[in-house]
Regions:
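Eukaryotic alpha-helical scaffold "rod" segments
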Residues: 19-25, 118-122
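Surface-exposed coil loops of outer-membrane beta-barrel proteins
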Residues: 1-21, 30-52, 133, 137-147
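Exposed, low-structure sequence patches enriched in small/polar residues
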Residues: 52, 56-360
């Protein structure tokens, strides 16, 4: 805190914006406008030499069209005109933006948007979406935003016999829209989930999640020995049982999970591969006469990598209760015992506690 150069200074930034729209909940269009600008003299001169003042205008459109009860389209689009350095010289030509924005040699105009189609037919829900963000798309209205990529996503869900719920998702993404990177990175995320209710007390949920990352040539051919080609797969199974009496409400759940993270490069040595197995057990009881919940949990995790193995066991006991007439004062407390071991390296046993209160 005593070092004046430990953290860069920041310009005083002024901004304004508005939103206007027309339509109903099913069919509408909204217009957004944001303008933000840094005040060049708001920081010390020593910092001005290192940090350029910036300016930004963003125009956005958001809309929805519902041609049928079972089909709806939504879209979001934005154009950002960004001056990366207000001190840069102006372009000596007349443009239609002169009255609202000084076009400089540091100015960038970039586009971002997405389009979604949603389908809902007799127990089947489906959607498809596409998103594109141009390289160097930047806005002073957001702290951080990924750019230089496009993606396509699909989702599908249905219910069978009013007892079984099925859902699946898939999305693919690739960067290097500018075609200027050395390599193009592609990522694919996919998942499938199923949930079945047996009677009025028992439920079973199973799921699979996967991620595949690969690399293609950009301005340079990919080297087979260093090519990125990784896959992560995760499987889970969760049976749960619950029932109530006049005095108590009981719920028990068991969770089993296995995750495999591996390098698919044929030249890989397996040093970065990790396989994790986890098992969890939870029991909750609601004591109705005193309106208090008690929870007992236990979890075991075992991760095995290249010449390494990690083991963790955690047991905890917690309680919570709401007070006052509106039940808006909440108190909770818990105590936990944790055992961690890195095989042939270290072992640790720790005890912890937690107490929290909230009012809403």
């Amino acid at each position: 805190p005593t070092d004046p150069f430990s953290r860069p200074s920041q310009y005083k930034r002024m901004g304004w914006g508005f939103k206007m729209g027309y339509g109903s909940g099913k069919n509408y269009i909204d217009l957004y406008l944001l303008r933000a600008c840094d005040s060049e003299n708001s920081i010390d001169e020593i910092w001005r030499q290192q940090i350029p003042p910036q300016e930004n205008i963003v125009v956005g459109l958001k809309g929805r069209v519902t041609p049928f009860k079972w089909l709806a389209f939504t879209a979001n689009m934005a154009t950002s005109v960004f001056n990366t350095d207000l001190r840069a010289p102006e372009i000596p030509i007349t443009t239609k933006f002169d009255k609202i924005f000084d076009v400089k040699y540091s100015s960038l105009m970039r586009f971002a948007g997405d389009l979604n189609a949603n389908l809902n037919l007799k127990g089947v829900n489906a959607s498809i979406s596409y998103r594109m963000v141009q390289p160097d798309y930047t806005s002073l209205g957001t702290y951080y935003m990924s750019n230089n990529y496009h993606s396509l996503g699909l989702t599908l869900g249905t219910t069978l016999f009013n007892k079984i719920s099925l859902s699946g998702t898939f999305s693919g993404q690739a960067d290097n829209l500018s075609k200027e990177q050395l390599y193009t990175t592609c990522g694919y995320v996919y998942a499938a989930n199923a949930s079945m209710r047996l009677g009025s007390h028992f439920t079973v949920t199973a799921g699979y999640n996967g991620y595949l990352q690969s690399q293609r040539a950009g301005t340079r051919a990919v080297n087979d020995t260093t090519k990125i080609h990784r896959m992560m797969s995760s499987y889970s199974l969760t049976p749960s049982y619950s029932y109530e009496t006049d005095l108590l409400g009981h719920s028990v759940s068991l969770t089993a999970n296995m995750t495999q993270n591996e390098d698919l490069n044929k030249f890989a040595t397996g040093e970065s591969d990790v396989k994790t197995k986890a098992l969890g057990l939870s029991y909750n009881v609601d004591v109705k006469p005193i309106e208090t919940d008690f929870t007992l949990t236990y979890s075991h995790q075992e991760s095995k990598g290249f010449k390494s193995k990690y083991i963790s066991d955690v047991a905890s006991l917690g309680t919570s209760r709401s007070f006052l007439k509106e039940k808006n004062l909440n108190l909770s407390a818990s105590v936990s015992l944790c055992y961690n071991e890195i095989v042939r390296q270290s072992k640790r046993l720790s005890l912890g506690g937690d107490f929290s209160t909230s009012y809403n």
